[in-house]
Amino acid sequence: MRALLPLAEMGEIASFFAVDREARAGERLNIAMLRSSAAVARVTDLVRKYAGPEARPVRAIAFDKSPGSNWFLSWHQDRTIEVKSRLEVAGYGPWTRKQGRLHVSPPFSVIERMTTVRLHVDPVDQHNAPLLIAPGSHRSGLVSTPE
């Protein structure tokens, strides 16, 4: 989408993601701090228009993918979710920690109900596009690593 939000609202969102550029690959943010933002509310409303009225944000991650701090990332599927506590439930695992936060790989039936929304707060064009997507790959279920 182009011009999803006015420039001022994108600036508001960008201010939430002002992280130490040397800190780490992705800074996981406290979703509670985003709830009061009118710009985030507008994005949530747009997502609900397409994903349904029950859609809600569950995680926000800021990535600094600028030329000075970029890193290589091969094709992959995001397969983990952040959880508050560890409960042994059939189909969930393995467990990991990312920046001290607990994550688990859930059954694919959980993953396939999730939608990722990516906002670029810096100018993006065909020469610096930070993300490549394999269209339709979500219909293939869990894809093995070599694929």
How should each PLM-predicted stretch be described?
Residues 5-147:
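Non-heme Fe(II) oxygenase catalytic core, chiefly the N-lobe of the double-stranded beta-helix
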